[in-house]
Amino acid sequence: MLQLNSFAEISTLADRLPVADEAARAAALARQNSLTKPVGSLGRLEELSLHWAAWRATERPTITKPQALCFAGNHGVCAQGVNVFPQEVTHLMVKNFEMGGAAINQLCRAAGADLQ
């Protein structure tokens, strides 16, 4: 695993990233707009797919090894009274993820994605 020790190292690494392929983005947008659906009806997913097409330099990029990452924490939000569940529920929800009983598990299973 790559270890980065400073923001300068991250910046240097980012400078070496390939530039977006605008022709691929345009082709992906044209394809999106030709689909039988209202323009923009898939929300942010449409924007993400255009970014992915430009990044991969192809109109129809594929994801060969899908993976979902799940992060959980309380970070004091329960003390603010904005969460509908008590703090103890976080641990139980994560345990349910680990046991394969949550909606995210089913979505990952349907997509063939690994859940971490």
Swiss-Prot record:
One of its GO terms (biological process) is cobalamin biosynthetic process. Transmembrane segments: none annotated. One of its GO terms (molecular function) is nicotinate-nucleotide-dimethylbenzimidazole phosphoribosyltransferase activity. It catalyses: 5,6-dimethylbenzimidazole + nicotinate beta-D-ribonucleotide = alpha-ribazole 5'-phosphate + nicotinate + H(+). The keyword Transferase applies. InterPro entries: Nict_dMeBzImd_PRibTrfase (IPR003200), Nict_dMeBzImd_PRibTrfase_N (IPR023195), Nict_dMeBzImd_PRibTrfase_sf (IPR036087). It holds the Pfam family DBI_PRT. Keywords: Cobalamin biosynthesis, Glycosyltransferase, Transferase. Its EC number is 2.4.2.21. SUPFAM superfamilies: Nicotinate mononucleotide:5,6-dimethylbenzimidazole phosphoribosyltransferase (CobT) (SSF52733). PANTHER family: NICOTINATE-NUCLEOTIDE--DIMETHYLBENZIMIDAZOLE PHOSPHORIBOSYLTRANSFERASE. Belongs to the CobT family. Catalyzes the synthesis of alpha-ribazole-5'-phosphate from nicotinate mononucleotide (NAMN) and 5,6-dimethylbenzimidazole (DMB). This is Nicotinate-nucleotide--dimethylbenzimidazole phosphoribosyltransferase. The gene is cobT.
